[in-house]
């Protein structure tokens, strides 16, 4: 059911209601009975003969019929109490919103401000604030308990096949356990191998974890530009993206009303929100990178941290000494953030202020538990530039910065390319693990060829599946509009579904113990011709049903034992089922003919094995003719015929 609810006609309309034959359920962790961890239960048809299937759910309360959605008020801020109960924080007035925060937009173009105002929190003193600091001190937070329950997909105990699934996969050194415990989560965060991006000011958040020993996650990018989109569209795209499976969303807005757009998104987002602060900082100085200053950038970090942004992409690895390494590239510097900082460095002939002030950035981000997403500003923008010295020089610097951020108590993940051909992908993963101490890797694709504008969701989905299998923790989606324009909601859905496929394929390859449950359930539904179950178990039930109904639209076709590709006579699965039914109704002599093993004579009837087989085949040939030479027969008629033969 897709209901476009709009409590205020001047505010965003968002999609609510569950996916077909699904319902929102909540798991309750044994160690924290006050927590309710969301899952989506896919309800199978009565004839399925198997239980309903719980799956990971990112859609938040938008698919819970028991929750009234009002985007003007935002979502419940239940997590704020968790933060306050831990202590070590203070509530304060926060900075004033300035005209430049929204690009000095005039009254005629100003978006309506979000209704509610929440005073921000910040850490004080030496008490642990970040999930990394709690983990290092051996403290299991509610967020850690929450994500452990979430990662197990509703399983209360180890699957019977868990060890076999792990053994069957190739994890390339990952250590995926058969069952996720809160202690395992804490240990992975303490080692720096996983993060829970969770700003203390994002009270609406449903915590999730990013790390190669957990389910592979995906990110969806949204955001306005100077020429298109609005607050309404971006809030709608955020809700639409998480409906289809986006684990995090990045707001990459570069036009008017940046602060206001972000506030509406955050107050209505149950998933982590990331940004690239340099984009907004650039808008504050009229789009001229030369005018950027550390003070302006720092103020932007504080502004966004107070709002609740969960992770910042910071291109601190773009150093003055690396810029010349891009001179011989085919496509130069393709990262917006990277090119901004490169121009600043060259204009001032100084080291990047992001690099020289990195310690101070860490101190600021720690106060709010904003996670680092250390940006790859020198990523390759073409196959020809993949794995060059510029790319890897920056990666080595990101490894150095990771250690500094950890020492300051911050959570860190590393961004990666880009455009990389298949044979060069694993080198990227191996080098990132080595240089960055196994901090989670977060890549854009990578795109595996440059020849398919309009289809780069496919060129990148191929690379994403591979690098996810090799150990990449989160995959940033690419839409069909990549390199061509700003994606609309249809492009967002296509990008999300494409990357859910890639992430799931990676989990299957790694041998994640619960990954294959959904595949097997759908395969059984396919073999049993349970069409509705096939649709509903898929990542996109609406499209699957629409494709089926283009040629077989009647309700009777939803129970037919064929589809339009092969028709009723040539469906391999229907033929296989008929063979099974036929075998079940064979008489003893017929079974002997078809199942004899070994050579020699069949003493009880005085015939050789070949004679028995020939006789059996002759009987079946005659029987086929007697029953009208029909390929498909009623099972009861076959059984009656068999009784006459036996």
From Swiss-Prot:
Its cofactor is [4Fe-4S] cluster. Residues 1-21 are annotated as: Disordered. Residues 1-13 have a biased composition (Polar residues). Binds 1 [4Fe-4S] cluster per subunit. The cluster is coordinated with 3 cysteines and an exchangeable S-adenosyl-L-methionine. [4Fe-4S] cluster binds at residues 563, 566, 571. Zn(2+) binds at residues 419, 483. GO terms for cellular component: cytosol. Pathway: Cofactor biosynthesis; thiamine diphosphate biosynthesis. Substrate binds at residues 221, 250, 279, 315, 335-337, 376-379, 415, 442. The keyword Iron-sulfur applies. Coiled coil: none annotated. Pfam families: ThiC-associated (PF13667), ThiC_Rad_SAM (PF01964). It catalyses: 5-amino-1-(5-phospho-beta-D-ribosyl)imidazole + S-adenosyl-L-methionine = 4-amino-2-methyl-5-(phosphooxymethyl)pyrimidine + CO + 5'-deoxyadenosine + formate + L-methionine + 3 H(+). It is an enzyme of class 4 (lyase). Its EC number is 4.1.99.17. Gene3D superfamilies: 6.10.250.620, Radical SAM ThiC family, central domain. It comes from the Bacteria. GO terms for biological process: thiamine biosynthetic process; thiamine diphosphate biosynthetic process. InterPro entries: ThiC, ThiC-associated_dom, ThiC/Bza_core_dom, ThiC/BzaA/B. Keywords: 4Fe-4S, Iron, Iron-sulfur, Lyase, Metal-binding, S-adenosyl-L-methionine, Thiamine biosynthesis, Zinc. Catalyzes the synthesis of the hydroxymethylpyrimidine phosphate (HMP-P) moiety of thiamine from aminoimidazole ribotide (AIR) in a radical S-adenosyl-L-methionine (SAM)-dependent reaction. Belongs to the ThiC family. Homodimer. This is Phosphomethylpyrimidine synthase. It comes from Rhodopseudomonas palustris (strain HaA2). The gene is thiC.
């Amino acid at each position: 059911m897709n209901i476009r609810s709009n409590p205020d006609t001047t505010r965003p309309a968002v999609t609510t209601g569950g996916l077909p034959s699904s319902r929102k359920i909540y798991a309750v962790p044994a160690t924290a009975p006050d927590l309710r961890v969301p899952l989506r239960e896919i309800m199978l048809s009565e004839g399925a003969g198997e239980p309903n299937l719980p799956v990971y759910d990112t859609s938040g309360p938008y698919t819970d019929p028991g929750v009234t959605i009002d985007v003007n008020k935002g979502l419940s801020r239940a997590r704020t109490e968790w933060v306050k109960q831990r202590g070590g924080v203070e509530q304060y007035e926060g900075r004033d919103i300035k005209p430049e925060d929204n690009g000095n937009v005039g009254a005629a173009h100003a978006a309506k401000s979000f209704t509610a105002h929440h005073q921000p929190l910040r850490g004080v003193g030496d008490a642990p604030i970040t999930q990394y600091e709690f983990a290092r001190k051996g403290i299991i937070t509610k967020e850690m308990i929450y994500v452990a329950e979430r990662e197990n997909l509703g399983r209360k105990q180890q699957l019977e096949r868990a060890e076999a699934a792990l053994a069957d996969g190739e994890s390339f050194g990952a250590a995926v356990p058969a069952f996720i415990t809160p202690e395992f989560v804490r240990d992975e965060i303490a080692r720096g191998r996983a993060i829970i991006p969770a700003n203390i000011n994002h009270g609406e958040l449903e915590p999730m974890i990013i790390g190669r020993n957990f389910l592979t996650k995906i990110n969806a990018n949204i955001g306005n530009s100077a020429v298109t989109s609005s607050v309404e569209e971006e809030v709608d795209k955020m809700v639409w993206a998480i409906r289809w499976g986006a684990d995090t969303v990045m707001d990459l807005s570069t036009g008017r009303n940046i602060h206001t757009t972000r506030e509406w998104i955050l107050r209505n987002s149950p998933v982590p929100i990331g940004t690239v602060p340099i984009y907004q900082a650039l808008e504050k100085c009229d789009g001229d990178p030369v005018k950027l200053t550390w003070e302006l950038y720092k103020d932007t970090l504080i502004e966004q941290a107070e709002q609740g942004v969960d992770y910042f992409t910071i291109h601190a690895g773009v150093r003055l000494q690396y810029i010349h390494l891009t001179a011989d590239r085919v496509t130069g510097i393709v990262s917006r953030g990277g090119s901004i900082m490169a121009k600043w460095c060259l204009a001032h002939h100084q080291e990047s202020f992001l690099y020289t002030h990195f310690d101070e950035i860490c101190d600021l981000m720690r106060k709010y538990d904003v996670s680092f997403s250390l940006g790859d500003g020198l990523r390759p923008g073409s196959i020809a530039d993949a794995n060059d010295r510029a790319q890897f020089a920056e990666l080595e610097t990101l490894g150095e910065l990771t250690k500094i951020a950890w020492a300051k108590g911050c959570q860190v993940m590393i961004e990666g390319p880009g455009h990389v051909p298949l044979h060069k992908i694993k080198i990227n993963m191996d080098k990132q693990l080595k240089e960055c101490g196994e901090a989670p890797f977060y890549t854009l694709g990578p795109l595996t060829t440059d020849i398919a504008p309009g289809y780069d969701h496919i060129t990148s989905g191929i690379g994403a599946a591979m690098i996810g299998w090799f150990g990449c923790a989160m995959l940033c989606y690419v839409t069909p509009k990549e390199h061509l324009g700003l994606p609309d909601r249809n492009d967002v859905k296509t990008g999300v579904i494409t990357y859910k496929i890639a992430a799931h394929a990676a989990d299957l390859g790694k041998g994640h113990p619960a990954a294959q449950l959904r595949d097997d359930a759908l395969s059984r539904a396919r073999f049993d011709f349970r069409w509705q179950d096939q649709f509903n178990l898929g990542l996109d039930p609406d499209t699957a049903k629409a494709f089926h109904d283009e040629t077989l639209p009647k309700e009777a076709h939803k129970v037919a034992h064929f589809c339009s590709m092969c028709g009723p006579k040539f469906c391999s699965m229907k033929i296989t089922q008929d063979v099974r039914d036929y075998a079940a109704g064979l008489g003893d002599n017929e079974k002997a003919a078809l199942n004899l093993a070994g050579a020699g004579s069949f003493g009880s009837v005085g015939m050789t094995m070949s004679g028995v087989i020939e006789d059996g085949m002759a009987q079946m040939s005659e029987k086929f003719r007697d029953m009208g030479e029909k390929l498909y027969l009623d099972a009861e008629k076959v059984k009656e015929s068999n009784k006459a033969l036996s």
